[in-house]
Amino acid sequence: MRRTKIVVPIMLTELTELEKVSVSDYHSADIVEWRADFLSADDIFEMAPKFFEKFKESKILFTLRTVREGGNIQVSEKKYLQILQEILKFDPDYIDVEYFSHGPSFAALKNYREKIVLSYHNFDEVPTDLTSRLIKMHEEGTAFVKVAVMPERECDVLDLLQITRDMTLEYGNHFISMAMGDLGRLSRISGYLTGSCWTFASLENSSAPGQISLKETVEILDLLENELA
């Protein structure tokens, strides 16, 4: 049995695409992530009831990844909060909130801490203040804390692994971390060492550089973690 949960994103660009999605393709995933930032706000609102009905047997993470953190949608703080509040009416298992980009929205959603994956994405580097950022995010008391950063050299990946391990030992097993790009692939399958509790895998199109396919991720984690659970 695997320790690390596998999250697989679904990135739909048109309302009609949902009909073509086969739920059975995601059976190997522990969590389905609806990356809604490829749709307009109005289309998100229209698709939401259909999406949650279609994946009612799955655990769902809702993510609205903004341009500022590597995503595809640019919205005001007010609109960002409005979208998240509307989605919460459908009772998702988890909802991503960009902590440093949308602090006011997080403040308005603190009553949903048990559902929140508090996130931070840096597509330029592994920041030198990453540990202090993780501590600050941890102190907010959300279900999970997620960071995705871009390594420039091998030691950046090793630093992230060590930081994740240190945070897990000190504060508990609710951290999700990954180094992006091909250089960072090791971080996506080393949760059994670092304590990172989720990894993100792709079914077809990856949602982040360096993402490994669902099939390969299942095979690798089964090999690495099967005797550890």
From Swiss-Prot:
Keywords per UniProt: Amino-acid biosynthesis, Aromatic amino acid biosynthesis, Lyase, Schiff base
Associated pathway: Metabolic intermediate biosynthesis; chorismate biosynthesis; chorismate from D-erythrose 4-phosphate and phosphoenolpyruvate: step 3/7
Residues of the signal peptide: none
Taxonomic superkingdom: Bacteria
Active site: H121 (proton donor/acceptor), K146 (schiff-base intermediate with substrate)
Amino acids binding 3-dehydroquinate: E33, W34, R35, R65, R188, S207, Q211
GO terms under biological process: 3,4-dihydroxybenzoate biosynthetic process; amino acid biosynthetic process; aromatic amino acid family biosynthetic process; chorismate biosynthetic process
GO molecular function, a single term: 3-dehydroquinate dehydratase activity
Enzyme Commission (EC) number: 4.2.1.10
Reactions listed under catalytic activity: 3-dehydroquinate = 3-dehydroshikimate + H2O
Function: Involved in the third step of the chorismate pathway, which leads to the biosynthesis of aromatic amino acids. Catalyzes the cis-dehydration of 3-dehydroquinate (DHQ) and introduces the first double bond of the aromatic ring to yield 3-dehydroshikimate.
HAMAP family xrefs: AroD (MF_00214)
Family: Belongs to the type-I 3-dehydroquinase family.
Assembly, per entry: Homodimer.
Protein's UniProt name: 3-dehydroquinate dehydratase
